[in-house]
Amino acid sequence: MKRIAICPGSFDPITNGHLDIIERAAAIFDEVIVAVLENSSKAPLFDVEERLGLIRDVTTHLPNVSADAFGGLLVEYAAEREAATIVRGLRAVSDFEYELQIASINKKLNENVETLFMMTNSQYSFLSSSIVKEVAKYGASVSELVPEQVEIALRKKYQVSSGQ
């Protein structure tokens, strides 16, 4: 039986921290689905198709990784995709408290789905998509924070929105 895991998130945009977790999950599981939440309460910079495209672009070196979008409950999506594990990255203790609540309700909704917490690499412990967008918005380099394709997409996005 294939070991399938889901790495869920908004990925707006995908960062080197996300990619680190995805690569490590890909080394453990037979298949990893990077699942982009469609109906997030956040107002995204990149639409779902753009985010899926960026994820696919930066994971081409990982043959067992795919990208997909989902709406609704994550555990229902996991069951549809026959995934037994949800992989979540943790940056700090503050992440753990929130993630533990989500993992607990997911377990209550579907006892067959486990949540695996992975500590992020310490060089990415401060990193979030929000921080990346804030830095990029002001024209500063994010080359050490995101893959090159994402940096290019951010530059284009902010040039368009600033009218340059």
From Swiss-Prot:
Chain residues that bind substrate: 10, 42, 74, 88
Pathway given in the UniProt record: Cofactor biosynthesis; coenzyme A biosynthesis; CoA from (R)-pantothenate: step 4/5
Alphabetized Pfam families for the sequence: CTP_transf_like
Binding site for ATP: 10-11, 18, 89-91, 99, 124-130
Catalytic function, reaction form: (R)-4'-phosphopantetheine + ATP + H(+) = 3'-dephospho-CoA + diphosphate
Keyword presence, Transport: no
GO cellular component: cytoplasm
Superkingdom field: Bacteria
Main location (coarse class): cytoplasm
Subcellular localization, as worded in the UniProt entry: Cytoplasm
Enzyme class, spelled out: transferase
EC number from the UniProt entry: 2.7.7.3
Needed cofactors: Mg(2+)
GO biological process, one term: coenzyme A biosynthetic process
Keyword Nucleotide-binding: yes
Site (Transition state stabilizer): 18
Molecular functions per Gene Ontology: ATP binding; pantetheine-phosphate adenylyltransferase activity
Keyword line: ATP-binding, Coenzyme A biosynthesis, Cytoplasm, Magnesium, Nucleotide-binding, Nucleotidyltransferase, Transferase
PANTHER family assigned to the protein according to its UniProt record, in alphabetical order: PHOSPHOPANTETHEINE ADENYLYLTRANSFERASE
Function noted in UniProt: Reversibly transfers an adenylyl group from ATP to 4'-phosphopantetheine, yielding dephospho-CoA (dPCoA) and pyrophosphate.
Assembly: Homohexamer.
Family, similarity comment: Belongs to the bacterial CoaD family.
Protein name as catalogued: Phosphopantetheine adenylyltransferase
Species assigned in the record: Exiguobacterium sp. (strain ATCC BAA-1283 / AT1b)
Lineage: Bacteria, Bacillati, Bacillota, Bacilli, Bacillales
